[in-house]
Each structure stands twice: as C-alpha cells, then as structure tokens.
C-alpha cells in the first residue's frame, strides 16, 4: 500500500488539497500589462508629441489662440456645445466627463501650475484649454479619438439619450401665475432660473473653443435673449406693482365703511345709549385713515426706490454686457428674489410654527400681501390694541420685496375665516397650504368679491358680536369634544366585544399604594408577617454524609456494633451533621439555668475580694461529694414505723409576712426560720423507696449503674482512647489497615483448613 494513503488521517479532501501540486499550466504568460507598457512611448517621445502649453494673458487683452490639428473636429464640437447651451442639461456624469465649469472665484493659472501627470495619463487624447473673454473661467474639452465617425455618432447618441432621460422638474411652490408676464422663448422649463444660468454658462463653450470666427454663436444670442427677457420680466413685475388696481380693495372698503358709519351715526344720535359707541367708532375711523395714509406714503416711496434701483442695475448690466456674456447683476437679483421667495424653506419645523405672540411685540411675517394687510387693519379696527403704522409699512415693504404673487395669497386669504388659524405662509407650512389649495384656485372676480364681501361687513355687528362669537365658538368646541368623548366611552363600555378592565386598573393602583408583604408571607390582623411556607418545605442543613453512616445506634445488639458506633468520629465531631447527632436535637434554650450555690453570692456586696475567695474555697472543701452510683440502703424497722405516723409539712403565708408592717430585718428573720424548718423536715420518701425495693437483691438494685460501668464497649473505649484521639491522616489510616490485615491473616492461619467453615467463621468473627 502506498505510504501517502496510509497517512491520510484527516478527510480525503483536505489531504488531497495539501498534497496537490500546480505546474502553472493555466497561467497566461503573455499579460496585457506587458504589451501595454511596451506599446507606450517613452517620456521623451511623449513630450515631443504634445502641443505647447497656452500662454495666458494677464492684462485681459486678446489671447492668442493655438491652432488645432483638425478644423472640422473643432467645428463639430462648436455645434455640439451650442446644442448644449440651447437648453439640454446633461446628467452629472456627462457634465463631469465633457464639461467642467468652475463656479468658485478662479485663480489665474500659469503653465507651471498645470499638472503634467494628467497629460501623461492620456497620450492619445489631451485636453486643450482656452480662457473665456473675461478671463475668469477656463473650459476644458477632450480631443476626439482617431476614429472620428464612430465618436461623432456616439456623441450624438449620448445627447439624444440625455435629452430623453433628463427629468423635467416640476414647479415648486408656485400656486398660479396670472400676472401679465411674457413667456421666454427658449427651451428652458418655466420656474427654474438655475437652469437659465446653467444654459448661459454652458454657452461659453462656443467662445472658448472658437474665437477666430466673427459670427456670434447660438449660445450668445440665447444668453442675450435670456437677459433681455429677464429685464423685461422685472420691468413688467414692477409695472404690475405700480398698477392702481392692486389697491382698489382698500378704497372700496374705505367707502363702504364711511357709508355704514354715516348711517349708524344718524341712528346713534337719536339713541343716548349708543352715543358712546358712535364716539368710539369715529375715533377708530380716524385712526384707520391715518394708518392708511402712512401705508400709502411708505408704499409709494418703496416702489419708487425699487424702480430707481432697477434702472441703475439695468444700466450697469448694459455696460458690462460687452465684456461678459453672463450678467452678474442678473444672478444677484435673481438669487435675491429666489432667497426672498424661498426664505421660509430654510426655516426649521420648530421655527415655522411660532405664531404671532402679541400684536405689538411680534414682527411682521414675510410673504403677506395686500389682502392680508387689509384683514389685519380691519381686525385692528375691531380690537382696541392696534399695530403701529411703522409695523404696517414694514409689512408692506416686505410684501413687495418678497416677490410673491398677489392672487396667490388672495386665494389663501379668501378661504380663511375669523375662526381659522392663520398659519405662516413661509417655510414648512407654505408648501403644505400650497398643495392643499393648488386644485382649489378661484377666479379673479370671485376672489375679489369674496374679499370685498368679507371686508364690507357692518362694523356695528362686528363690535357687538365679537365677544359672543368667540364665546360661542369655544362653547361649541367644548361641546363637540365632550360629545365625542362621551360617545367613545359609551361605545367602548357598551360594546360586547371589548370592555375596559376597570378592576385590573383599580387593583394595580391599590397594589402600588399599599404596603404589600413579600412573597410567601401574609399579614395578620395585627399587621405582622406570617410565613406561609410549611416547615417541611424549608431548606435545612444537608449532611455531607449519608444517613446510614451517621446513624446513632443507641441500643447496640452486639459488642462489635457498639465499638463501630463509638469509632464513628464523624458522627460525633462533624458540625455538618447537626440533624442526626443525638443530644443536639433538644432545644437547650428552653431549659432553665443551671443551679448555683447561693452561699457564694450572699456576701457579694462586700468589697473584700480576698475574703470572698477564702469563703468560696472553704465552701468547695466542705461541699459533700455524692457517692458514685446510686446506693440505696435497705430501711430499718424504725424508719418503716415513721411512715405510718402523720408528719405534716410546715406551712407559712409568705404574702402575709411580706405585706406586714414590720421592719425588713424581722421579715428576713421569719423567712430564714421557715427555710430551716423545711430543710429539717423529713417526708420519708427515701424510706418508702427503699421499702419498695427490699424484696430485690443487691445485684438487681445496682443493675443500671453496674451494667453501664462494666459494659464491654465502655472498657474498650477507655483502653483505645489514644487510637481514637488520633487524627484521620494518611499515615494513621495506613497503619490501621495494616493492623486489620495482620489480624485477618492470623485468623486465617489459625483456623482449621476446612473450606466450608473458613469464610463463614471469618464473617461471624468466631475466631
């Protein structure tokens, strides 16, 4: 058998894998990396094939352009760049691969700052760079690969795919635009100014690639159209705000209020009770007129300032349009408008739910329009505490600066009533309200009529029923809440499927508040803990030895059993066998104290310690020592005659002696005499016991003591006291075993060699 098969102690698979050899037959020595390194030119040749780096002009003059190797490829890329600038937005990956636009402030680069490693990594296709006319942006594009036709088709295909796959984002936070604005004639989606900016930025490709052509590119014309349309859009916006129709509501409300006040004044003059109300209404009307005049003056000054700023911005844009195709003022104004329009989006949820705390301390909210201001003015007419004219003017200025649509907020205010909660129109709640009310937009006439109808209500009715409406609305809300709560409780209680477990709730509450006993105990009527665990279930000290080993043989039947019982030192001296050792079972705590010799403590009050010691020594000497054993003598005839005589026991009333009026010395003397008489009294009990035992012999009378004193196991115990007192060590155990073996050998050798009686005699110990 082969040696390798014999040594296979593990599994066959692992042993085979460990013994297998690989000769490298499946290895392809001709690696592609070697061919690539061989085919690549050297560094010197690579530097010769590369074009010279562009020389940057630091004076913002005309930059000399470097000629390309192929003019047709440049024209094709120019057309493609124009298509990109026309409005097709690439995905992020395509923009990173084809066009890189730097939005940060550009630091002018020198030829030394250009990384050579990026040029060395792509020897066949290098990047050419050319600065924009303003010298602030650098656009890089790759040269086409040698196979031009295939690359052109691939580029066209990628452009078409990007057009189809580019999602057209929905317009965010736009309710409806009914303002007379002109639509921009471009492929850009409406409501996205970032895409306009990207289109104008991407239009720079045409100028950066081909600066030799005198013809303006498509992107330039489109960017100019975007700028002109943006300017027209802003002009139309401000013209729209200058229209007097926007503030027609205030004039209508004012006229209606004046008419109603004149009618009410004629009625109130006749009634003396309403004269005070008329005076208050006149004062409120005067305050309202003053507030409206201040609002108008502030509004006119605000609009004129905004128009003046816009004209200056337009003039600066016209001057800078020749040097830069991308207008910086346009981006600033558009970004300001976007920030003001979407200012609330930056708010967090907690900030957006902070409502107006008070009329005088709260700041005006951004995004409120003229209708909301008119609503606030009328509410201030009803309430005595009105906002100041400066706050209202500031609110108006924020309305114009925010750029929100007029009719957009008018729809919101038309749906809000006095009982509704006026939420913020910016931030988190703006989008929620816009989504809910997007499908419920009203026409211009309806919205205006609704606002006019709500504003032209009678001032008298509002003053009289203001507090009543508030109280009624609160009462109605409370009633509806109570009804809903009662109905829910009724349905839950009366339903057959589910009922509230009131007992469990009550028990749980009572258990938490009550003083509960620990588990296994209860409290009796006195409040004391009572253990419910029976004594048989309580754990006791378990003996380390079995009950057979530690059993106390109180009445041995044979001498050998007695000897083994005494030799069982584990039973006597092991503290773990408390349950089985006799004598410890009794409760010593219940026993009375041991008797003491009273004579030792009679004169204990004396301070002489030496004298007390002498008396104790003398008492111990004179103390009678009881005889060993029980020695009962046989009674004589005289003693037997005494038993027939009546011998009464002397008695005295101790209570009478103690409660007498005599002195303490006399009381003590009487008690001592009574004690002496009791000591001298002979009841004849010993004589009676001896008489009852006169028929028994001496051996029978002394049986108990003699049997215990002369027992065999007691004698062996005293004889083997040295062996029993030794510790159970290994040496002592070995010696005991050897002694037993020698003793057994003697028995076997001394016995007669009869097979039948040999083992039986050893077991019966008859040797």
Swiss-Prot record:
Region (Disordered): 20-408, 439-501, 506-525
InterPro entries, per the entry: Fyv8 (IPR026248)
Biased amino acid composition, Basic and acidic residues: 35-48, 150-171, 180-196, 219-240, 285-299, 391-402, 459-484
Disulphide bonds in the chain: none
Biased composition regions of type Polar residues, renumbered to the chain: 119-138, 372-386, 447-458, 485-495
Role description: Involved in the resistance to unfolded protein response (UPR)-inducing agents.
Family: Belongs to the FYV8 family.
Protein name, per record: Protein FYV8
Organism: Candida glabrata (strain ATCC 2001 / BCRC 20586 / JCM 3761 / NBRC 0622 / NRRL Y-65 / CBS 138)
Organism placement in taxonomy: Eukaryota, Fungi, Dikarya, Ascomycota, Saccharomycotina
